[in-house]
Amino acid sequence: IAKKFDHNIIETLPALVPLTFSEKILEMCKELSGLSVEAIVSFNKVLFQEGMLFTHRGLSGPSILQISSYWKQGDNIKVNLSPKLNVYKLLEEKRKLNPRLDILNIVSEILPKRLAQIICSENKVSGNISELSNKILKQLSENINAWLINPTGSEGYRTAEVTLGGVDTKELSSK
């Protein structure tokens, strides 16, 4: 009908939809399925600080659903798994105060234990914090405060809560 009145039609896309990932990240998500964390999820200058849920299909939860409306195929999103904390500063402080602390125990104070175990394993860190270089601590903290991930897609219209696009509302009047 809108085309008959010469209205511009914007391509429709699924929005407010869970994101899917490559096999490596998907395996991690499956291991953490059901775990929810408070996170900041961002794409370009758009960010949302809300819950993020690991599922057997990828990532979901309010922050992921929101960012899915802005994310473009092929681009990375950034996830801050500990938005209230500068993890690198905390790790430096812990190392100064008690160099014998186990890195997994420290990360488990910041994140749920299952997530902490996977992050430490993925970063190949274990043992006393005093044994870890600044470079390793910085890399570990970046994977917590600025985890860059590249979704392979979304779950599509099947699970989308809304649709982007359609009739260009700039061409409509409420009068």
Where are these predicted regions, by residue range?
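An anion/pyrophosphate-binding glycine-rich loop and adjacent beta-alpha core
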Residues: 8-13, 17-134
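A glycine-rich dinucleotide-binding beta-alpha-beta segment and adjacent secondary-structure elements
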Residues: 117-175
